């Protein structure tokens, strides 16, 4: 088991900021098209974070042209250039699947205050 843990530790990313469900994040993705590389930004609310070692994932939801788009990102993916936390949200759940049914102002998340 020590060999497996050692390999997992070597493959983990340490440059990812701490974020949780309800936060608004910008995920900078490295896209390879032929020989060219470019960075594409996916900004939205984190609706789920699955912790773990190398298999950790997080789900980001955004509204694009009136259509909800969700994308699941592996946290240790080499295609993720960086993750920025834009705002921190105050929520009482760890899984925000109820946002799928809400539209407009009802789908807003309150900002987390400093108390």
From Swiss-Prot:
Family: Belongs to the bacterial ribosomal protein bL19 family.
Recorded coiled-coil stretches: none
GO biological process, one term: translation
Species per Swiss-Prot/TrEMBL record: Desulfovibrio desulfuricans (strain ATCC 27774 / DSM 6949 / MB)
The entry's keywords: Ribonucleoprotein, Ribosomal protein
PANTHER family to which the protein is assigned, alphabetical: LARGE RIBOSOMAL SUBUNIT PROTEIN BL19M (PTHR15680:SF9), RIBOSOMAL PROTEIN L19 (PTHR15680)
Domain of life of the source: Bacteria
Protein name as annotated: Large ribosomal subunit protein bL19
InterPro entries membership: Ribosomal_bL19, Ribosomal_bL19_CS, Ribosomal_bL19_sf, Translation_prot_SH3-like_sf
């Amino acid at each position: 088991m020590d060999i497996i843990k050692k390999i997992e530790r070597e493959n983990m990313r340490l440059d990812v900021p701490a974020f949780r469900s309800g936060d608004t994040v910008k995920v900078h993705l490295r896209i390879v098209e032929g020989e060219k590389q470019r960075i594409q930004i996916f900004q939205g609310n984190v609706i789920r974070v699955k912790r773990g070692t190398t298999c950790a994932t997080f789900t980001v939801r955004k509204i694009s042209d009136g259509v909800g788009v969700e994308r699941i990102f592996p946290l240790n993916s080499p295609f993720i250039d960086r993750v920025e936390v834009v705002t921190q949200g105050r929520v009482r759940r760890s899984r925000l699947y109820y946002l799928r049914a809400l539209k407009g102002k009802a789908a807003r998340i309150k900002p987390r205050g400093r108390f």
